[in-house]
Amino acid sequence: MNRHTDTHYPSLADKVVLISGGASGIGRAFVEAFVAQGSRVAFLDLDAEAGQGLAHALGANSLFLPCDVRDIERLKACVAEVERTWGAVDVLINNAARDDRHALADVSVEYWDERMQTNLRHAFFAAQAVAPGMARRGSGAIINMGSISWMRGRPGMVCYTTAKAALNGMTRTLARELGGQGIRINSLVPGAIRTERQDAMWAADPAGLEAASQAFIDQQMLKFRLDASDCARLALFLASDDSRGCTGQNFVVDAGLSIQ
């Protein structure tokens, strides 16, 4: 049983899926959900221990490749390895990102560039690398992970919100550029998603975690805490043939948090 959804998508069986940042959090939920659909899932991550452990648990339909997505040559090499192993990528999910907080006055040129490498640049070059194979097949789906933070103008993370806003523009432009080749590109935009990383950050203060969770729920239209499975359900739909008419769009899963 797929713990992320009871829905089965026949069109995802045997599809080759590539996910960055797949060893933990939302990315891990993606990996597990697609493997449960019968897809062949390659995933990238910096955390080799977590990645190898997940691949071992999931079996032959998963492939972990250690990768720092800031290293574009390594990223391209990983795409090539997936293609050698399973053939052209059918579904790409550009998930890797970090939303570290930072003060405006503390941002250096070096920090700015590193944040763009972490949160934006790799998404373009991953799409560039998989697009030829998708075009040869006449189909493909690319999902870019957005954020409601730029929609809300959230302070204290301007490098992150800038990168995520730019990713929205990239999604729309590439959707138009590649649509004639049967390639669909959409953004999946999460709201306040509870993950293992957040739980670890609040481990010494469980009451604080619950208070923070309740604060998000109070701002949402729907009164429950979202988790990674909510994103995984939407990703499966956007990757499947059921969403064949959807491209160039933002699909928001935030329980109404971004509506002010």
From Swiss-Prot:
Induction section of the entry: Is highly up-regulated during growth on sulfoquinovose, compared to growth on glucose or succinate (at protein level).
Record note on pH: Optimum pH is 8-9.
Active site per the UniProt annotation: 160 (proton acceptor)
GO function terms (MF aspect): oxidoreductase activity
Matches recorded under InterPro entries: NAD(P)-bd_dom_sf, Sc_DH/Rdtase_CS, SDR_fam
A Pfam family annotated for this UniProt entry: adh_short_C2
UniProt enzyme class: oxidoreductase
EC id: 1.1.1.390
SUPFAM superfamilies given in the database record: NAD(P)-binding Rossmann-fold domains
Keywords: NAD, Oxidoreductase
Catalysed reactions, as listed in the record: 6-sulfo-D-quinovose + NAD(+) = 6-deoxy-6-sulfo-D-glucono-1,5-lactone + NADH + H(+)
Family from the record: Belongs to the short-chain dehydrogenases/reductases (SDR) family.
Record PANTHER family: OXIDOREDUCTASE, SHORT-CHAIN DEHYDROGENASE/REDUCTASE FAMILY (AFU_ORTHOLOGUE AFUA_5G02870), SHORT-CHAIN DEHYDROGENASE_REDUCTASE FAMILY PROTEIN
Function per UniProt: Catalyzes the oxidation of sulfoquinovose to 6-deoxy-6-sulfo-D-glucono-1,5-lactone, with a strong preference for NAD(+) as the electron acceptor. Is involved in a degradation pathway of sulfoquinovose (SQ) that allows P.putida SQ1 to use SQ as the sole carbon and energy source for growth.
Protein name: Sulfoquinovose 1-dehydrogenase
Lineage: Bacteria, Pseudomonadati, Pseudomonadota, Gammaproteobacteria, Pseudomonadales
